[in-house]
Curated annotation (Swiss-Prot):
Signal sequence extent: none
Subcellular location: Plastid, Chloroplast
Key words of the record: Chloroplast, Plastid, Ribonucleoprotein, Ribosomal protein
Keyword Chloroplast attached: yes
InterPro entries according to UniProt: Ribosomal_bL33, Ribosomal_bL33_CS, Ribosomal_bL33_sf, Ribosomal_zn-bd
Main localization of the protein described in the UniProt heading: plastid
Gene: rpl33
GO BP field: translation
Pfam family membership, one: Ribosomal_L33
PANTHER family assigned to the protein according to its UniProt record, in alphabetical order: 50S RIBOSOMAL PROTEIN L33, CHLOROPLASTIC, LARGE RIBOSOMAL SUBUNIT PROTEIN BL33C
Keyword Translocase attached: no
Protein name as annotated: Large ribosomal subunit protein bL33c
Length: 66
C-alpha cells in the first residue's frame, strides 16, 4: 500500500508573455499546457520553455494555481 501523499501532481503551465502583455485583439487567448511534476524533485514552481501559438514563438510558461 502507498504511504503518504503522492509525489506526482498535475500542474497547469501558462504563458507568462501573454499574461504580462494582456489579452488584446491580436492575441485571442492565453496559452496553457497541462503536465505533471514530482514534488520531491521540484518543490518550487515549475517553469518550462514551450511554444505559444498566440505569441508565435517559444516563451516561458510558469506554473499557476488551480
Amino acid at each position: 500500500m502507498a504511504r503518504g501523499k503522492d509525489a506526482r501532481v498535475t500542474v497547469i503551465l501558462e504563458c507568462t508573455n501573454c499574461v504580462r502583455g494582456g489579452v488584446t485583439k491580436e492575441s485571442t487567448g492565453i496559452s496553457r499546457y497541462i503536465t505533471e511534476k514530482n514534488r520531491h524533485n521540484t518543490p518550487g514552481q515549475l517553469e518550462l520553455k514551450k511554444f505559444c501559438p498566440y505569441c508565435y514563438k517559444q516563451t516561458i510558461h510558469g506554473e499557476i494555481k488551480k
